[in-house]
């Protein structure tokens, strides 16, 4: 089970209930959040009923949790992003642009069959182009700690510890990633807090495309009928409500349906304690 933090800076949020002075202070406050600089995994055990449970072992090297080097202000991944000439204007060691202002903001994760990890970038969107980073983490046994270390390896043509894939998502950033067979489903949305209906793009045969790429290759994936298309979604759930219901996550419900979860869900989605209504849409 893989997890990734946004690696973004956060800006204070103005509110109608505050006076002008307080709102100006909030908008001028940009700071890191230690919980955001994380990439790691925990091992899952599968029983005979196809149910999974987390492995909490600290001794078995094959099932120990693992994470990349990180602290309260950065990580191995963010250090690499800062070295990337495409992103240096968005982040440096002295600060940067907050995530919700089209700064660095990671959302969405999917794994390939050869051990690579794909992370989607909600921002920055560069002149309408969204970016997926392909990572190749390697586990390093760390017997004197509670978790092993993951180390990113250099891949791709840039000498960085990731390879970039550039996607034409009509100006939207990436909110989540999900495999559907060999196709990669991409939940897209604004880099800021704008309202938007759920948008899902299908990168056809993406799994095969990764396998065919040479080690020194990066590609632009343009919208076309045979490669990258926007999905037509037939909703069988509640419709997204303006001012709320920001599509945040997707997962296959079955072979013909996709489940969509929302950040800041409408109050209409809460019908009993400890539960929330999501949408099931036709693929």
Q: What is the role of each PLM region?
A:
Residues 1-283:
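Sequence/structural signature of beta-propeller domains
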């Amino acid at each position: 089970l893989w997890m990734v933090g946004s690696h973004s800076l956060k800006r204070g949020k103005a509110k109608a209930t505050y006076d002008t002075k307080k709102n100006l202070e909030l908008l001028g406050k940009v700071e890191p959040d230690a919980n955001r600089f994380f990439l790691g995994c925990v091992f899952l055990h599968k029983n005979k009923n196809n149910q999974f449970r987390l492995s909490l072992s600290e001794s078995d090297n094959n099932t120990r949790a693992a994470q990349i080097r990180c602290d309260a202000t950065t990580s191995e991944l963010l250090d690499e992003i800062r070295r990337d000439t495409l992103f240096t204007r968005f982040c440096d060691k002295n600060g940067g642009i907050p995530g919700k202002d089209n700064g660095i903001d990671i959302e969405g994760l999917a794994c390939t069959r050869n051990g690579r990890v794909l992370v989607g970038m909600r921002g920055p969107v560069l002149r309408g182009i969204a970016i997926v980073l392909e990572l190749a983490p390697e586990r390093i046994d760390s017997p004197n700690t509670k978790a092993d270390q993951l180390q990113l390896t250099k891949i791709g043509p840039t000498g960085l510890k990731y390879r970039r894939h550039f996607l034409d998502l009509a100006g939207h950033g990436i909110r989540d990633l999900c495999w559907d067979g060999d196709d990669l489903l991409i939940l897209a949305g604004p880099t800021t807090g704008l309202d938007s209906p759920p948008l899902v793009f299908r990168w056809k045969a993406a799994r095969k495309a990764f396998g065919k790429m040479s080690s020194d290759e990066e590609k632009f994936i343009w919208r076309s009928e045979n490669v990258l298309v926007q999905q037509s979604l037939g909703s069988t759930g509640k419709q997204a409500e303006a001012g709320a219901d920001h599509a945040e996550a997707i997962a296959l419900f079955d072979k013909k349906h996709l489940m969509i979860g929302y950040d800041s869900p409408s109050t209409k989605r809460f019908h009993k304690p400890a539960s929330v209504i999501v949408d099931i849409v036709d693929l």
